[in-house]
Amino acid sequence: MGFFVTSANPGKGADLGGLAGADAHCQSLARAAGAGNRTWRAYLSSGGASPVNARDRIGRGPWRNAKGEVVARDLEQLHGDNNLNLQTALTEKGEPVNGRRSQPNTHDILTGSQADGTAFAGSAEDRTCRDWTSGGEGSAMVGHHDREGLRDDAPSRSWNSSHPSRGCGMEALRSTGGAGLFYCFAAD
């Protein structure tokens, strides 16, 4: 396994304890699933004076889900024509994540990223819930792991850059169809 969607939020909405806290959550979930021997990174960008791009944190691929299915061979395919969808975006336990047509809808996945996997550098708008340290004020860019939205357009079908959340707390994340989940990739 080299890719999964977190099965649970660490408990504070989009306050993940920064990138380090999010990476630790990925590592902990992977360890519990028997894949802790790899180096796990959260697919999250951060802004500020020194932006960090999600795509630069996750290694070079290929990435397989818990069932061994390849979701992407490399960074180019991951940010292009990948195999990430409702059937393949599984948790570390190999379980599906509810999509837009399920109850509760949990298809909004935290990324803080643009479609090419880069940060919103220079943007005055918060797209990372204060670099993943806010569980209240702010907003996070989310993607749709099921590739479905309210419209049939590219952002609605984007796995990593669909729309901003209404806030950073769990209630705000739930109100737009999320559960504070995020993607984890093996960087090695």
What are these regions (language model features)?
Residues 1-188:
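Secreted/extracellular ectodomain signature
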